[in-house]
């Protein structure tokens, strides 16, 4: 690798961009200089491996990941950067933190048929430490809720040496066993998303698609608890064992928001949710970087900064509405009549007051774009999506406005007047006949 330096992400920029702010504390506690810490972190014999699985997926999260800019995929893994004129090479900033290998990805790896070999290596400890990234929903392969015809399956990760099917459920479960950290990325992998939707009458798809985490609003259990139930009913004893919940020596905790939130990796980390449909690439990249930094002893425990739905607070700590450039219109009770109007789109169905994300503030790619720049928030970062937030383009019944101050009371009055005038004006605009 060339040592040519350019205008890419520096070592200190990389740490800052990852959302980790504890480097100074780490240095103070360890008594090491920055360069000493960098040297200590390097361990070519023990890289941080990334295993990325694709289950019931569309690939949208992978595309978003490839679009990450701060830092970019190329900068992190290869040291390639674009200086505005040509492609350049430099020493990758991630090398300061120890090597990272993307061991497995169904789309990005050089050849297929590697799933089983990767699983075997992971089970044997040959890939330790590794971070497991789950994209796409999991399915009821073992007939806990729905009995499939014999020999059929919903999702395959590949073939075993004997020619039999390697089920996605089996693949992910076995990778969970030795993972240092697990991150679920996208609405489907986190809380089930669109594949787990109902028909409006509470009836689910025969796949009984589920996310890695429970959706308490729709009553859907996450994959860890599903696997535990499968084991208890002896539906797949050769694939799923009791260690699904005894890995940390703790009993099953079914407290809100659900048992799968309390499952822990062997390092004691819960499943981290990178929720959205899909999340922006920078959200995925920076969350994975925080896991890598923690694994290297260079950053704080990511579990200390998660909200109740296991989402990183540095991305999901505020409502989408709070970050929205149209929020001022909301407070004034000024609402858009149609798409293209500059006012608040609450009246057109925006669910920004019911969801958490930084999309309006950070944009989508390199600070550009974002849902509310041209459309409405459909609450894809929240459990309950999509069922609880449909129809997407119908205005909610009533906004929720704080009433503890005079300003809030005045704002509430303005919103009520604004929504009312919007409804009357829309009625006047409606074509007759």
Could you say what each language-model-derived stretch is?
Residues 13-35:
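N-terminal export signals
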Residues 398-410:
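Juxtamembrane/start-of-transmembrane alpha-helix segments at the extracytoplasmic/lumenal side
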Residues 281-285, 289, 293-362:
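A conserved mid-domain beta-alpha-beta active-site/ligand-binding segment of alpha/beta enzyme cores
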Residues 1-10, 37:
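N-terminal secretory signal peptides
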Residues 57-59, 191, 345-348, 370-384:
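Local cysteine-cluster metal-coordination motifs and their immediate loop/turn environment
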Residues 431-433:
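Cytoplasmic C-terminal tails of single-pass
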